[in-house]
């Protein structure tokens, strides 16, 4: 019995470290169960307490783009429908600030709402419209699509500019309602998560370090490893792969 307990504790520590020390008992229990371990979340929590480990996070400093267009011409097509049934049906985008000792840098991200995957991102030293356009172009190239899809954002000046409208000419533009930031909750939640789980652990020196940290979190953890409750406790990448397999008839979903 003691041997099994120690073996489970070793697995808990491995999963904990692999998650960049972000996973608490619920997610660690899910990972153990996926590998065939029969264990309750409460037991995992008990073992973690005995081991002196817990999910690490730092409260994020919050700031967002300011709405610059309050006209009635911008419509909320998405209307908080955050669960599309396929990839490339709805993208959402937002800009967030990251503090460094040399000053703020700015992260523009685009998320595919189907899988919550970050499909494109750009870190820059300014908040120019060109940074958003670069991110849009990356997303279009990576997803290899030229279809009319919905792209949702807030009403910041970058997202209501003529350059943005040109870059998204074949897409349906959707905007958060006036003073309703939660209309873009999924991407804003991701930015908060990035800071809480990773960025705010560090005193970031400069742009290069900020870029490396963002790259490590998004490309080496969030998209590829971090399990997401919305995705049935698998990573965004795995969720999209599962969709492809089901769509090709390679496997059948139970139910």
Would you name each region that the model predicts?
Residues 12, 28, 44, 48, ...:
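Mobile genetic element proteins and their domesticated derivatives, centered on retroelements
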Residues 1, 38, 82-83, 100-101, ...:
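Conserved, non-catalytic sequence blocks in retroelement Pol enzymes and Pol-derived host proteins
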Residues 64-68, 153-155, 161-165, 175-195, ...:
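RNase H-like two-metal-ion nuclease catalytic core shared by retroviral integrases
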Residues 48, 127, 175-177:
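Methionine-biased hydrophobic packing positions in alpha-helices, especially
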Residues 1-86, 180, 235-244:
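Basic, flexible linker segments flanking DNA-binding modules
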Residues 80, 84-119, 125-126:
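An active-site-proximal beta-strand-loop segment
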Residues 169-171, 193-255:
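C-terminal domain-tail junction helix/linker
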Residues 99, 103, 121-144, 160:
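Active-site beta-loop-alpha junctions of metal-dependent nucleic acid enzymes
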């Amino acid at each position: 019995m003691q041997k099994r307990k120690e073996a489970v504790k070793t697995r808990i520590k491995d999963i904990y470290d692999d998650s960049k020390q972000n996973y608490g008992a619920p997610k660690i229990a899910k990972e153990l169960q996926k590998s065939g371990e029969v264990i309750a979340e409460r037991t995992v929590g008990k073992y973690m307490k005995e081991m002196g480990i817990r999910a690490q996070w730092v409260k994020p400093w919050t700031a967002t783009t300011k709405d610059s267009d309050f006209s009635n011409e911008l419509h909320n097509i998405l209307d908080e429908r955050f669960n599309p049934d396929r990839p490339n049906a709805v993208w959402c985008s937002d800009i967030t600030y990251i503090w460094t000792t040399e000053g703020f840098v700015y992260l523009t991200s685009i998320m595919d709402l189907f899988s919550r995957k970050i499909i494109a991102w750009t870190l820059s030293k300014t908040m120019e419209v060109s940074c958003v356009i670069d991110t849009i172009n990356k997303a279009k190239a990576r997803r290899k699509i030229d279809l009319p899809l919905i792209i949702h954002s807030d009403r910041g000046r970058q997202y209501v500019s003529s350059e943005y409208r040109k870059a998204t000419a074949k897409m349906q533009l959707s905007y958060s309602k006036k003073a309703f930031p939660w209309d873009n909750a999924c991407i804003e939640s991701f930015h908060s998560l990035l800071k809480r789980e990773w960025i705010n652990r560090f005193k970031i020196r400069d742009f290069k370090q900020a870029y490396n940290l963002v790259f490590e979190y998004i490309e080496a953890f969030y998209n590829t490893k971090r399990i997401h409750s919305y995705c049935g406790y698998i990573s965004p990448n795995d969720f999209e792969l599962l969709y492809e397999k089901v769509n090709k008839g390679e496997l059948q979903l139970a139910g």
